[in-house]
Amino acid sequence: MIQGVIQKIAGPAVIAKGMLGARMYDICKVGEEGLVGEIIRLDGDTAFVQVYEDTSGLKVGEPVVSTGLPLAVELGPGMLNGIYDGIQRPLERIREKTGIYITRGVVVHALDREKKWAWTPMVKPGDEVRGGMVLGTVPEFSFTHKILVPPDVRGRVKEVKPAGEYTVEEPVVVLEDGTELKMYHTWPVRRARPVQRKLDPNTPFLTGMRILDVLFPVAMGGTAAIPGPFGSGKTVTQQSLAKWSNADVVVYVGCGERGNEMTDVLVEFPELTDPKTGGPLMHRTVLIANTSNMPVAAREASIYVGVTIAEYFRDQGFSVALMADSTSRWAEALREISSRLEEMPAEEGYPPYLAARLAAFYERAGKVITLGGEEGAVTIVGAVSPPGGDMSEPVTQSTLRIVGAFWRLDASLAFRRHFPAINWNGSYSLFTSALDPWYRENVAEDYPELRDAISELLQREAGLQEIVQLVGPDALQDAERLVIEVGRIIREDFLQQNAFHEVDAYCSMRKAYGIMKMILAFYKEAEAAIKRGVSIDEILQLPVVERIGRARYVSEEEFPAYFEEAMKEIQGAFKALA
């Protein structure tokens, strides 16, 4: 055991001397209270430690003890429906132990050591096992939780516990070399869990939000960023994704954001039902709360803890969504620690390795064949909070170069009460062409063409709006006025969505396709009518315009009949005009 003494304290950074033999990223117990810290730089026998708890009251000369182990998480049954702090300490158990405030130096296990789980073995004595293989299963809510061999373990099974109820601490499998395998194992958070190989992302991560699913889709196993200024709806968008996306498990990391936002999740999610299982939505969610009033250093750890938990569920063959809200606060934590270590700053005071750290985090997403031979995926959606909505700042620019989908939130849209306030002219997705075959097969053959037509109309409308602002709408011909009106219909009746409406909060691909088809059928017929000499005002008086506007509030069950009637009405209305 390596023990040194505190030489200097600078905010969350502690400099200790006499630490010869300690290693990078080892966990240390700092001071008399044993605060948790991590070595982030070594220089001779001097160690630079970032402390994950409040350092006020520490004194020079107090001991610093290296445990010789890296920051690791416990992975096993009991994580779902849990809420942890940034270094995987369960808040519920801390409250039982110390009350409503987190006492410094408190030690609690991440997984419940008392609870018994119904173990069903899947291996027998004599079997050869290796990392990632399934040893047995445990039911957890509506999931079958697979107990995995840790990735770096292999050997022959000597004995297996029979089916029954055991705690996570009891060995359930013993190998011939004496290795005892329990229902849980630990894994260092800074090391990506190994996989057999990565796959091309070719299935969409469906969110239930029309603008994202249709115009800017992200693939299962892809990465997306949601940058936007304050009040533009980043958190509500991420909470909608956590509620309605087609992921099996959601890991929600509240990194340096307000505590109320985590409270919202804790209040709302248990009341909502998971459309797949019918159980509470909280049963598929792991929350990591590292709010703005918690120590800065733990923000950096919380992102890694979240992605490691996501990789563990991926290794069981689940598709996992990781919501990081917000990566800007994480970058600010890097900046804070970097300045305390007196490192050379780069742009806006951020450390020069900011882009490398962001890339290393986002690269842990992906659709993979796991070590156990199953298919799993981690999709990462990171919110970015640029100060004052300035998209040219380093975190946004570094993220922009890494992610596959960029959903830009716009304050001017939010002020106009257009939600989700995603700017369709400033966002993009690199997954569109890779996902087109899936859409052709599972939605409709002409789906990509309809989507492109909608995009083109929105771009034409944006160009015409500039002319309107200069010379007014009267200078436009009827055909151009039609483009502006259809653009308005697309914006208000297709792109807008009410996250708090019981029907409109979620929209299936079939329904989105139906609404697109109705809008484009209306545009085609109206364009032909204008060529025949019908005035634009007559066209806009048609009751079918209102019918298209009501489509988004029609339930999924009633929509097919509604769609058929609307299409007939569009045909009939324009015949009557002729």
UniProtKB/Swiss-Prot annotation:
Designated name of the protein: V-type ATP synthase alpha chain
Gene name linked to the record: atpA
InterPro entries for the chain: ATP-synt_VA_C, ATP-synth_a_Xtn, ATP_synth_asu-like_sf, ATPase_a/bsu_AS, ATPase_F1/V1/A1_a/bsu_N, ATPase_F1/V1/A1_a/bsu_N_sf, ATPase_F1/V1/A1_a/bsu_nucl-bd, ATPase_F1/V1_b/a_C
Catalytic activity: ATP + H2O + 4 H(+)(in) = ADP + phosphate + 5 H(+)(out)
The UniProt record lists the keyword 4Fe-4S: no
Keywords attached to this entry: ATP synthesis, ATP-binding, Hydrogen ion transport, Ion transport, Nucleotide-binding, Translocase, Transport
Gene Ontology BP terms: proton motive force-driven plasma membrane ATP synthesis
Top enzyme class: translocase
Enzyme Commission number(s) of this protein: 7.1.2.2
Function per UniProt: Produces ATP from ADP in the presence of a proton gradient across the membrane. The V-type alpha chain is a catalytic subunit.
GO cellular component terms given for this protein: proton-transporting ATP synthase complex
Molecular function GO labels: ATP binding; proton-transporting ATP synthase activity, rotational mechanism; proton-transporting ATPase activity, rotational mechanism
